[in-house]
Amino acid sequence: STLLASSAASDVYKRQNDIVVDTTCISDTPDDILYFDIETTGLSANRSDLYLIGLGFYDDDHFKTLFLFNDDGCSEPEILARFANHISRYRYLVSYNGDTFDIPYIRTKMQQFDIDCSFDNIRSVDIYKTSRRYKKLFNMNSVKQIDVEDLVGFQRKIFISGGTLINAYKEYLKTGSSDLLDDLMTHNHDDVRGLISITEFLNLPRICNELETLDVSRTDDFIEYTCSTPKLPCRITYSSPVMRINANDRQLRILIPVTQKTMKFYFKDYKNYYYLPMEDMAIHKSMAAYVDSTHKEKATKETAYTQITDVFIPAPSHEKNNIFYDTGINGGRFLRLSDELTSIGQVTTQYIQNMISVVFH
């Protein structure tokens, strides 16, 4: 449908039936959530004008957008007052880089026009703060909103640069061109719809704490864990020497290499151990008392170890206990593959959470 603005500070609604996202990462009640994006003629609230506030909200089982438009170049107080009235109905205010730009800009404008608006009762949710943490995971050159939209497959109707938008608005004020108005509205409409479409990026930090192990399968070379997760924004793949991850929708699969070889286990209280050079191992001093002094020496941090041949899997990076070290050229930290780690249970889930925490931090 065509977007129209009929008067100064006009309200323009558009129904949205084509966006389905999981908003539970923000609230279990979609009606509590307000998405917003602003359009201005500059970055400084003291030296520029606010000409459009786009709002997205859930109503009657659908997302809708509302545009508060400064149609005559003089209606900033009116659209700000309407915005202040509108946000009072919501508990969460969702934006992209809004904590840095949109909200401070609006606060300054509210002060300029002496408009009473408190953000104390509404919680800001800035998706940019989450998406920037996963720039490397998704191999992004930048984390602009449009880059994140590309990952979820969102397609804009038009793309107009910021400078072009400002010129279009100034020209609209002179001519009242319906084509320019349509461009201005469509761009902001895309901003709001795009913002809604990337909501599920907020689920990424929840993965570690909320995943559940569904299945465990084992081959000679790998162990594969299948887990349920919160709704994911897009397919996620990750590969390193210690694990491979493939995740999509509400499921994550992690493939862990299995190795059978001899590894070293180091005793932390090395001062209580003696090293036996002939056997290339350390034993506790209570046992060393029965060993001839010519066949033993006090252990150091480097020699206070025993060697065990078993089946191992990589240890999480921050795991400190029961660590075995590869004696080969590649090195590495490992855990013994116990029965608990090959069956569904809390030990397995904790292991998976610890392994993937380096990815979904």
Residue ranges and their predicted role:
Residues 1-9, 13:
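Single conserved hydrophobic/aromatic residue that forms the stacking wall/gate
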Residues 4, 43-47, 137-140:
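Short glycine-biased active-site loop of nucleotidyltransferases that positions the nucleotide triphosphate
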Residues 8, 37-39, 102, 126, ...:
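Acidic active-site catalytic centers that drive phospho-/nucleotidyl reactions
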Residues 18-89, 240-247:
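Conserved RNase H-like, two-metal-ion catalytic cores of nucleic-acid enzymes
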Residues 55, 82-85, 104, 108, ...:
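Residue-level signal for well-ordered alpha-helical scaffold segments within enzymatic catalytic domains
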Residues 63-141, 326-361:
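Conserved DEDDh/DEDDy metal-dependent 3′-5′ exonuclease domain
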Residues 138-139, 144-212:
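Acidic, Mg2+-coordinating catalytic module of metal-dependent nucleases/exonucleases
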Residues 209-329:
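Polyanion-binding interface signature
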